[in-house]
Design a protein with these regions (language model features):
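A short, Lys/Arg-rich alpha-helix, primarily the initiator
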Residues: 1-15, 20
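Alpha-helical residues within the helix-turn-helix
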Residues: 12, 23, 51
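Helix-turn-helix DNA-binding elements, focusing on the entry/boundary residues of the two helices
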Residues: 18, 46, 58
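Short, basic-rich loop-to-helix N-cap that marks the start of a DNA-contacting helix
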Residues: 38-51
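Short C-terminal boundary/hinge segments that cap the last helix of small helical domains
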Residues: 54-66
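Recognition helix of helix-turn-helix/homeodomain-like DNA-binding domains
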Residues: 27-41
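Key DNA-contacting residues within the recognition helix of helix-turn-helix
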Residues: 8, 33-34, 62
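Short alpha-helical DNA-recognition segment
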Residues: 15-31
Length: 66
C-alpha cells in the first residue's frame, strides 16, 4: 500500500498535476486516480514515478506498512 498523502505532496513539490504524472508514466489520468484511490500501482509505474519525480527515499512512499 502506498502513502497517497506523501505521493501527492511530492507531485505538488514538482509543480505537476496527477494528470501530468499519469501521462508521463503512460497511463490515463482516470487510471491514475483509481490507482491513487486504491493505493496500488504496478512495479513499472512505481519505477517510472521514482525517476520522474526524483524521489530520494521511495520506501517511505511506496512500501509503507499498515
Amino acid at each position: 500500500m502506498i502513502r497517497v498523502d506523501k505521493l501527492r505532496g511530492v507531485i505538488a513539490q514538482k509543480n505537476m498535476s496527477q494528470s501530468d504524472v499519469a501521462k508521463a508514466i503512460g497511463i490515463t489520468p482516470k487510471t491514475f486516480y483509481t490507482k491513487m484511490k486504491n493505493g496500488v500501482f504496478g512495479s513499472d509505474e512505481i519505477d517510472a514515478m521514482i525517476s520522474l519525480l526524483e524521489i530520494k527515499n521511495p520506501a517511505d512512499i511506496f512500501f509503507a506498512r499498515g
